[in-house]
Structures are given as C-alpha cells and as structure tokens.
Amino acid sequence: MDTLKQLIDYYQTNGSYVMEEFWRHFLMSAYGVIFAAIIAIPLGVYIARKKRLAGWVIQIANIIQTIPALAMLAVLMLIMGLGTNTVVLSLFLYSLLPILKNTYTGIRNVDGALLESGKAMGMTKWQVLRLIEMPLALSVIMAGIRNALVIAIGVAAIGTFVGAGGLGDIIVRGTNATNGTAIILAGAIPTAVMAILADVLLGWVERTLNPVKNKRKPLTEAL
C-alpha cells in the first residue's frame, strides 16, 4: 500500500514530466518504425521477386536483430553522439526485420492465379502490385509493423543511457533512489500500457485489412 501511495503521489507531483517523457518515448519509437517501413516495405517487395537475393537480405536483417540493444547504442553513440537521433537509428535497425520479412512473406503468398488474371486483363507490373499484391499482403505487412512497434517501445526504454530521455529516464531515476520502487513503476507502467495499446490498436487495423474477412472487390472495379 505504501508503494501504491508513493506511486500516486509521484504522478500527482510529476504528472507533466511523465507525460512529456511518455510522448518523447512514443515519438522515438514511432519515428524508428516509420523510417524502417519506408525502407523495408519497398525492399521486401523487391526481394520477393529475387529469390537468390532474399536469403542474403533477410539474413543480414536477422544478424542486426541479434545485436544486444546496449551494444548497438554504444556503437551508434560513437558515430552519432548522444541524443534521440542515436536511439531512433537503433530502433530503425531493429524494426527492419519484422517489416521486411512480413512484406516478403505477404507478397510471396499472393495467389498466383490472381496475378495471372490481372496480367490477362492487361495490367502492367505496377498495376498488379498496386491493385492485387499490396492489398492482399497489407494485413501481413501491418502485422510486421505491429511487431516492430512493440519491440521498439521496449528497446526505447534504454535510450536514457545515451541522453535521449523517454520513460526509461524515470525507471533509471528509480533504480538510483534509495527506496525507488514507486518511481520505477511510474516509468514501467506507462511503458507497458503504451506497448499494449500499440499492439491492440495495430492488431485491430491488421484484422480490418485482412482480405479474408473483407469482400474482395472484383478486378474490374479496381480498374
């Protein structure tokens, strides 16, 4: 009960500070995922057509994913210095694999009969991609973005070690305090809530975009 009271008191006293770090934390995570999506989605579409290249590209993304977060930040800090840019770049790198792999999988799993139907109707490669492949793969791609954002929110917590702030800053303050359990929770709870909300919201978007649950428009309507 004492911890709960201290937690409530902390929020009442430092509410604006917690909200500021909450939004900073979210924006770092969101920017990292957005930049990764800008690169990974076109790259995933490209390697879906280049089977030999796909293995190498996905393997490189896998290797990046296995690098410990603190080690990644330490290396990037030597190159870019302290601050949010270092964290955003590390989140960008960690977000590449789920988005890239899901884009590749989504495009590869499109029914070949639909592709042939589109070509038979005189569609160009760009039209086939825009009107058939991307709509059918969109829910799978969104699942990758969803996973990437949840991962990014967790990893962003250690951004405090390179002076980027975020909710990790509150958690570290708690670990340095003599009786800092309430302060640790003050940073950990919003981090968990953010990850859960991101997962639920993007999960809903993913289900909405699922072509199996939506009536497919005839190709003639799409044209």
UniProtKB/Swiss-Prot annotation:
Annotated compartments: Cell membrane
GO cellular component assignments: plasma membrane
Domain ABC transmembrane type-1: 22-202
Top-level taxon in the UniProt lineage: Bacteria
Bilayer-crossing regions: 27-47, 63-83, 87-107, 148-168, 182-202
One of the GO biological process terms: glycine betaine transport
Keywords, alphabetical: Cell membrane, Membrane, Stress response, Transmembrane, Transmembrane helix, Transport
Annotated membrane topology: Multi-pass membrane protein
Induction of synthesis: The complex is induced by either hyperosmotic stress or by low temperature. Osmotic induction is sigma B-dependent.
Function of the protein: Part of the ABC transporter complex OpuCABCD involved in carnitine uptake. Probably responsible for the translocation of the substrate across the membrane. Involved, with BetL and GbuABC, in osmoprotection and cryoprotection of Listeria. Can also mediate weak glycine betaine transport.
PANTHER family: GLYCINE BETAINE/L-PROLINE TRANSPORT SYSTEM PERMEASE PROTEIN PROW, OSMOPROTECTANT IMPORT PERMEASE PROTEIN OSMW
Family statement: Belongs to the binding-protein-dependent transport system permease family.
Subunit structure: The complex is composed of two ATP-binding proteins (OpuCA), two transmembrane proteins (OpuCB and OpuCD) and a solute-binding protein (OpuCC).
Protein name: Carnitine transport permease protein OpuCD
Organism of this sequence: Listeria monocytogenes serotype 1/2a (strain 10403S)
